[in-house]
A protein has these predicted regions:
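N-terminal, intrinsically disordered, polar/charged segments of Gram-positive cell-envelope systems
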Residues: 38-74, 187-195, 280-297
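Short aromatic loop motif centered on NTY/YTY
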Residues: 345-378, 383-452, 457
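Sec-dependent N-terminal signal peptides of Gram-positive bacterial secreted proteins and lipoproteins
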Residues: 14-41
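Surface-exposed amphipathic alpha-helical segments
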Residues: 151-188
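Amphipathic alpha-helical packing elements
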Residues: 208-247
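SH3/SH3-like beta-barrel superfamily modules
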Residues: 472-527
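Acidic carboxylate motifs that coordinate Ca2+ or other divalent cations, activating on Asp/Glu
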Residues: 302
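Secretory pathway targeting signatures of secreted, lumenal, and periplasmic proteins
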Residues: 82-130, 135-136
Length: 528
């Protein structure tokens, strides 16, 4: 059994929240994980800070690793990590056939399975979607490197002291990941810039694609084109690939010659296209309909098809209200849905969650100053307001991005003016009891589309959203991008050279430099 598979079994046992059962399952899992494994001690390392401008992906990773504070170095085969110095005497490292795991010692000593903090593994194949598993590097021979994190409790809940220490150590795990160095031949450390990093080197299988959603399949297919320098008319795709350190867009779509593809790339494209078609067939909603036409859908899962007619009625104040007629009965939804500048040619029928079997009617409004919003209603003998989502989460309205890829959730957009005006992904969850959409707060949010900014000078950034976290220095360069934000004071910045880290912003100033953002970055966008 593979290292990661064993760890995932341990996670599932932890989810049950019962300590005795957790201990039993973790003991069994640890036995499988370790096999002929052995405990290892790390040794102190006193490497100096590096500051170069080399832009190869392996060198960038090493520079970032070297920039992290001194600590305790540990090497397993070709993987080296640095643990925080304050962890001395508090951790246990256990090796397996395909990697190693790091534990909190006090929990591990009680039971070999508790105290799991993270693991690193090197396997001979690519896989996508395993629980708690993140690809950090891949090699030309097709092998892949992963780091693995717990997805739930991994300590003795009845020991307050052990729990406190575990939580403090867990907060520092991202710092360990930032120190990873891999010395293997042909290793590429920009794996996070790909959906399928080996699609130009290895044949894809259907199993590799099983856990990919609609958006990931679209990006994976276009990755094959992007590797050959194709540009994109789709704004989202162009923005997405511009952020990748490996991408150089040189060929316009109309000039691109597909003869540059290898036979394997062509086969992989066919595989991805077939998977996209299968996904669409398995997920028929949302469906787009024109106003003023009679449609038939079973809205309330009673086995009977409703006849639905929707139109728009203009009000005296210039706003619009959708008029919904179901089975000959007209419903007034004006209390919950006043459209300022509606999308007039269509509405949608959606299926936010398959669990309830119900469908929703969705109406789109551009708002007073292009602030798009989507209103959802359900039918249960009467029309009930489900809620609204900022943005239009429909592929044909949203640069091909599907906002319904997670069952029970709608992905819209939210606005930030933290450093500049920008839009990020927002998430709304359907409450199964109240049938209402509820906005979900996140620790950080992904920018939807970003433009390149010139970085005028060296910029110190942090490996986590913590002003005391280890520091990485970004070199001044022509292209940097904003990737994520907590919407409060932190923005994840990435350079075209591959370096990245969190920048703290307060009152329009970059904290680490004490300068106005306009004096650090070019072309910041501001609008009402």
């Amino acid at each position: 059994m593979k290292l990661a598979d064993c760890i995932c079994q341990m996670y599932e046992s932890m989810k049950k929240k019962f300590l005795v059962l957790t201990i039993l399952m973790c003991t069994f899992t640890t036995t499988l994980l370790n096999g002929c494994g052995k405990k290892q001690n790390a040794t102190p390392d006193n490497e100096t800070l590096q500051d170069t401008e080399t832009v190869t992906d392996q060198t960038v990773l090493e520079e970032q690793a070297d920039s992290v504070e001194e600590g305790i170095s540990y090497t397993w085969q070709d993987i080296t990590v640095t643990l925080p110095q304050e962890w001395e005497d508090s951790y246990e490292i256990v090796e397996g056939n395909e990697g190693f795991s790091i534990y909190q010692k006090s929990s591990y000593d009680k039971n070999q399975g508790l105290g799991f903090l993270c693991g690193f593994t090197h396997i001979g194949e690519f896989r996508k979607g395993a629980l708690g598993e993140t690809l950090i590097a891949y090699a030309d021979d097709g092998s892949c490197y992963y780091w693995i994190e717990p997805t739930d409790l991994a300590y003795d809940e009845n020991d307050a002291s052990s729990q406190k220490e575990y939580e403090e150590m867990a907060e520092m795990v991202p710092q360990i990941v930032a120190t990873v160095k891999i010395s293997g031949d042909g290793v590429h450390t920009n794996a996070d810039e790909y959906v399928l990093p080996l699609s130009d080197k290895k044949p894809l299988t259907s199993e590799m694609l099983d856990n990919l959603n609609d958006n990931e399949l679209m990006i994976a297919r276009n990755e094959i084109y992007a590797r050959h320098g194709r540009t994109f008319q789709n704004e989202y795709l162009q923005s997405y690939f511009n952020k990748c350190s490996w991408y150089q867009g040189t060929t316009m779509p109309e000039e691109f010659d597909e003869s540059v593809f290898s036979a394997m790339e062509k086969d992989n494209l066919s595989m991805l296209e077939a998977k996209e078609e299968a996904y669409e067939s398995e997920h028929p909603y949302p469906k787009k309909y024109e106003y003023g036409t009679v449609i038939e859908e079973d809205l309330n899962a009673d086995g009977n098809v409703e006849q639905i007619f929707c139109s728009l009625m203009e009000q005296k104040d210039g706003s619009y209200v959708p008029i919904v007629t179901i089975n000959g009965r007209a419903f007034d939804i004006s209390k919950d849905c006043q459209l300022i500048s509606p999308v007039t040619d269509c509405f949608y029928v959606t299926d936010i969650t398959a669990a309830d079997g119900e469908l929703e009617l969705a109406f789109l409004d551009y708002g007073p100053s292009y602030d798009p919003e989507t209103y959802f209603f359900r039918f249960d003998g009467d029309m009930e307001f489900v809620g609204s989502v900022d943005g239009f989460p429909f592929k044909d309205q949203n640069d091909g991005i599907n906002g319904f890829v997670n069952d029970g959730q709608v992905i819209g957009r939210i606005r930030t003016d933290l450093l500049e005006t920008a839009y990020l992904n927002g998430y709304w969850l359907l409450n199964e009891e109240t049938h209402a959409l509820e906005y979900q707060e996140q620790e950080e949010y992904d920018y939807i589309s970003t433009t390149a900014h010139q970085l005028y000078e060296k910029l110190p950034v942090r490996v986590t959203m913590d002003e005391n976290a280890p520091e990485v220095v970004m070199q001044k360069q022509a292209e940097v991008y904003f990737l994520k934000s907590d919407l409060k004071e932190w923005i994840l910045v990435k350079g075209k050279d591959g370096t990245k880290g969190y920048m703290q912003v307060k009152n329009g100033k970059v904290v680490e430099l004490g300068k106005s953002a306009n004096n650090v970055f070019s072309d910041l966008n501001y609008f009402d």
